[in-house]
Swiss-Prot record:
Belongs to the UreE family. GO terms for biological process: protein folding; protein-containing complex assembly; urea metabolic process. GO terms for cellular component: cytoplasm. Involved in urease metallocenter assembly. Binds nickel. Probably functions as a nickel donor during metallocenter assembly. Residues 134-175 are annotated as: Disordered. It is found in: Cytoplasm. GO terms for molecular function: nickel cation binding; unfolded protein binding. It comes from the Bacteria. This is Urease accessory protein UreE. NCBIfam families: PRK13261.1-1 (NF009751). Keywords: Chaperone, Cytoplasm, Nickel, Nickel insertion. The gene is ureE. Its main location: cytoplasm.
Length: 175
């Protein structure tokens, strides 16, 4: 069995399609497109995204991670205000959401949940079932997606791009 535990930018020699919930796991046994068995071993909290590549520990293969199509809810807002309201209410519930642009407002995809579907429908969005790869936003702090030796906790290199900083834990002292 191949051991996949190193991120790489090399050309892929194989692939595996994984649903969002599988891509969030740090330990996973998979069957590659070629039929070979492989084990994915990542640092706890590290998530995979469609397009990521993992190298085998022995250097014999590079596997591209594909976002597998899955059943989702698609909410379409016909104005920027409605889009913002729907995104706010889903985010307030910590729902993983994929954001897609449309000509007038925006489209939100999230995992199937009839209560959330009714909520965004009640706000005024048109709601439908969809089957598509799910690539939700990683969140305000990056969601554990790291490359190579980068570290989100390195205070001298706090993140990608300007104005990124490491979240601070405030210590409150008793009075």
């Amino acid at each position: 069995m191949l051991i996949l535990n190193q991120r790489t930018q090399q050309l892929a020699t194989d692939s595996v399609a994984l649903a969002y919930d599988e891509r969030k796991r740090s330990r996973l046994k998979v069957t590659l497109a070629s039929g070979a068995e492989a084990g994915i071993f990542l640092e706890r909290g590290d998530h995979l995204h469609g397009g990521d590549k993992l190298a085998a520990e022995d250097g014999s293969a590079v596997v591209e991670i594909l976002a597998a199509p899955e059943k989702l809810i698609e909410a379409i807002a016909d104005s920027p205000l409605l889009f913002a309201r729907a995104a706010y209410h889903l985010g307030n519930r910590h729902v993983p959401v994929q954001i897609l642009p449309t000509e007038n407002g925006g489209k939100l995809r999230f995992q199937t949940d009839h209560v959330l579907a009714e909520m965004v429908r009640g706000l005024g969005c048109s709601v439908s079932d969809a089957e598509a790869p799910f690539q939700p936003e990683s969140g305000a702090y990056g969601g554990g997606h790291h490359h190579g030796d980068e570290s989100a906790t390195d205070l001298h290199n706090p993140g990608h791009g300007p104005h990124r900083s490491v979240p601070k834990i405030h210590e409150f002292k008793p009075r």
